[in-house]
Every structure is written in C-alpha cells, then in structure tokens.
From Swiss-Prot:
It comes from the Bacteria. The keyword Ligase applies. This is Phosphoribosylamine--glycine ligase. Its cofactor is Mg(2+); Mn(2+). It comes from Vibrio parahaemolyticus serotype O3:K6 (strain RIMD 2210633). The lineage of its organism: Bacteria, Pseudomonadati, Pseudomonadota, Gammaproteobacteria, Vibrionales. Pfam families: GARS_A, GARS_C, GARS_N. Binds 1 Mg(2+) or Mn(2+) ion per subunit. SMART domains: GARS_A (SM01209), GARS_C (SM01210). It is an enzyme of class 6 (ligase). The keyword Ribosomal protein does not apply. Pathway: Purine metabolism; IMP biosynthesis via de novo pathway; N(1)-(5-phospho-D-ribosyl)glycinamide from 5-phospho-alpha-D-ribose 1-diphosphate: step 2/2. Belongs to the GARS family. Keywords: ATP-binding, Ligase, Magnesium, Manganese, Metal-binding, Nucleotide-binding, Purine biosynthesis. InterPro entries: ATP-grasp, ATP_grasp_subdomain_1, PreATP-grasp_dom_sf, PRibGlycinamid_synth_ATP-grasp, PRibGlycinamide_synth, PRibGlycinamide_synth_C-dom, PRibGlycinamide_synth_C_sf, PRibGlycinamide_synth_CS.
Length: 429
C-alpha cells in the first residue's frame, strides 16, 4: 500500500514515522518533506508544494495512492480534500467549507455562538475606530486575533490597553498579517490552563486522541511573543477523566453535530484549543483542522494503534468500530529553534550532533531542515523536536533534554521548562 502525507514539518515527520509502522505500507511519499523524512525507512520525499493542489492530485493518481493524510492547514483551506475526492482519491481531512473552522476566526466564533458551545465573549471588526472603542470599553487584558491564517502567530494577548490598540492598528491599517488581518476578532481574555484536545472525526463518529499541552510563548515561564509552539507533552493532567467527558459532551459532539446540521459534515483531525478554568469548565480558544505541531510528536510516540488503519476507518465512516490504544508512559517534545525565531532567523546553518543510532523511547523529529551537499542544515524557525517517553513527565523531560543537549548549530535555542505545569502537579503528589 502507498500513502501520501502532505507537509514538511515535525508533525509530518511524526505522522510518516508512525504510518510506516503499518506492515502493509510499502512506501510513504511526503510532499515536500524535510531532511529527516528523507532518511526515514519507507519514506520518500516528493518535491511538490503543499499548495500545488493540481500537482498533488496528479501525483496521487500516477502512484495509485490509497491514503493521503494532510498535515498543515493551508492546503485544507484552499480545498485539497475537495479536489482529491472529485478525483476519487481517498484522503483524510476536512473539505474547504469545513476547514473554515480554522480558516476564519470570525466564522468559528459565530458558529460557537449558534451552537451554544462555551467560548469567550467577542466581537468582529473590519474598521479601526469601532474596534478601538470596543477595547476601551472592555479594558485589558484582552485578546486581538487576525481573522485568517497567520501560521499560529496572528494572536496578540494584550495585557495593556496600549498593546491592544497597537495590535488593532497593525492588523487593520498596517495589515501586519497580509490578507489575514483585514478583519479582527477581539475577545475576552480567558484565565486558566490550556489543553490541546485532538480527535479524529468521520463526519459523525469521534475517536479521541491522547490529550496534550502545548507551550506557545517563545520564552521560559511563558514570556515573549507567541510562536507556532515551543514544545508539548502528553497526556495533559489538567484533563481529568471528568473534564475529558465534559469536553466531549460540551464541545466536541456539539461541534461535529453542528457542522453536519449546517451541511458541512466534518471529516479529519479536529483540534480544539481549550482553556480550562479552575471549576473545570472548558472554553474553546480556537479550532485547528489538523493535528497540532509540536503536539503530534509526543502523541505519536505514545500511539500504540495503527495510524493508517484509523485513517482508513475514518474515511469509511467506521470510527465507531475501532479504538485507539496508548502507551501509559508520558511523552515530551522540545522544539529546537533558530536564533531570532519567531521573528527573522538564519537559514543554512549546519546542524551537528544528530543521533546516529535511535534509542527506544527517544526520537528527533525534523521540521525546518534541509539536505545541502551531504550536510543537514537549518531551513526554518522551528528546526527539530527532541522527543522522549518516560514513566513520569519529569523522566520524559529529563530524557528529552539529554537528547537535545547532543545537538547544536549556530544560534540554536530552546525553552528550558517544557512540561513545567505537569511536573509541578507530579511534585504535589
């Protein structure tokens, strides 16, 4: 069997690595992939851009691909799933209409309101003056979001009124995020603990993945600007069995039923970014129509089920007939980033110290890497993700940092506290 995975990040490396464990899979093509996927057994990079829909369809036809898994959001929002389905090619992901859950923050907030799904109070604006009047009336802290896709960076958590006003002017006048900023959503600042709750959906049935928690801020103790994510761990102890049930009943099921009732049944990975308050009430911060990055890396380390079989079951609308199995151990992934990220950063720096031999329960997933004249070099802001399993989050953290310590390039940095909330909980016990 041949599989195609669309994307080039750490998430796609992890999905490809996991999919390769299926004994019936002979080749997994990754378009376009990275230096790490190129080295992986059974994986083969294909130089097709993630947004080249016609090229991807033609390739999948030519190679008789039996399953395509979409990693990033951009191809979903421009309709890759619709194009594959029209060509009769099996693909796991939401249609262009369903992908609005991630593609438009305003669509999502209005959808949540229509279906009484808990989220923060909000308003949408396209003009500066009314937006400024609204934040002055609401006060800070307050959250300002660019409406469209901004690679996870179009969200400003403004702790002062001045920051909120600057963000609004940037997004609407300066258009800091290209087209994405031509409308802003301003919403209430939610206090609590964040969790990433990712499920597989087949249009009707839902199969939860392991819980996880991402670390969005670039600096230790959650300081500095937001990024695409600096590290993650799984499971997230904030999601107790009781809170897990509440999330399914109050957020996930109403979302899946709501999308179906509006004529956009949802198939694919659905990621709810949640804030869980001190009473255990989950509120939706955002939806993503795909697996999170870097959450995928620790989650795939823990997955004992067969990813390919689960995706095929979802395409056949049979998710109610399968279950997911997980390693009871904790897993943690630490992102190694290029100096300057999430602003301007260097590319082309040679990476040294990558492990030559893989040890059970440890894996370095590649993201922004490239092969140049036999060297593996940096090619993005988030370059690698050092991931490890452990009997506790503390043990997984220790192993992951030991792994990260072996690797270096000019300007490399990482956070030093990934998993700190879960470790504090472990120490309380």
């Amino acid at each position: 069997m041949r599989v195609l995975i669309i994307g080039s990040g750490g998430r796609e490396h992890a999905l490809g690595w996991k999919a390769a464990q299926n004994p019936n899979v002979e080749t997994i093509f990754i378009a376009p992939g990275n230096a790490g996927t190129a080295l992986e057994p059974k994986l083969e990079n294909v130089n097709i851009d993630v947004e080249d829909i016609a090229g991807l369809v033609a390739f999948a036809k030519e190679k008789a691909i039996e399953l395509t898994i979409v990693g990033p959001e951009a191809p979903l929002v421009i309709g890759v799933v619709d194009a594959f389905r029209e060509a009769g090619l099996p693909i796991f992901g939401p249609t262009q209409a369903a992908a609005q859950l991630e593609g438009s923050k305003a669509f999502t907030k209005d959808f949540l309101a229509r279906h009484q799904i808990p989220t923060g109070a909000y308003a949408n604006f396209t003009e500066i003056e009314p937006a400024l009047a609204y934040v002055r009336e609401q006060g800070a802290p307050i959250v300002v979001k660019a409406d469209g896709l901004a690679a996870g960076k179009g969200v400003i958590v403004a702790m002062t009124l001045e920051e909120a006003e600057d963000a609004i002017k940037d997004m609407l006048a300066g258009n800091a995020f290209g087209d994405a900023g031509s409308r802003v959503v301003i919403e209430e600042f939610l206090d609590g603990e964040e969790a990433s709750f990712i499920v597989m959906v087949d249009g009707e049935n839902v199969l939860p993945m392991a819980t996880s928690q991402d670390h969005k801020r670039v600096g230790d103790k959650d300081t500095g600007p937001n990024t695409g994510g600096m590290g993650a761990y799984s499971p997230a102890p904030v999601v107790t069995p009781e809170i897990h049930n509440r999330i399914m009943e109050e957020v996930i099921y109403p979302t899946v039923r709501g999308m179906a009732s509006e004529g956009n049944p949802y198939t694919g990975f659905l990621y709810a970014g949640l804030m869980i308050d001190k009473d255990g009430t989950p509120k939706v911060i955002e939806y993503n129509c795909r697996f999170g990055d870097p959450e995928t890396q620790p989650i795939m380390m823990r997955m004992e089920s067969d990813l390919v079989d689960l995706c095929l079951a979802a395409i056949d609308e049979k998710l109610d007939q399968v279950e997911s199995k997980w390693d009871p151990r904790a897993s943690i992934g630490i992102v190694l980033a290029a100096g300057g990220y999430p602003a301007a950063y260097n590319k082309g720096d040679v990476i040294s110290g990558l492990p030559q031999v893989e040890i059970e329960g440890e894996k370095v997933f590649h993201a922004g890497t490239d092969n140049q004249d036999g060297d593996i070099v940096t090619n993005g802001g988030r370059v690698l993700c050092a991931t490890a399993l452990g009997n506790s989050v503390s043990e997984a953290q220790q192993r992951a940092y030991e792994l990260a310590k072996q690797i270096s390039w000019d300007g490399m940095f990482h956070r030093n506290d990934i998993g700190y909330r879960a470790i504090a909980r472990e120490q309380e016990k």
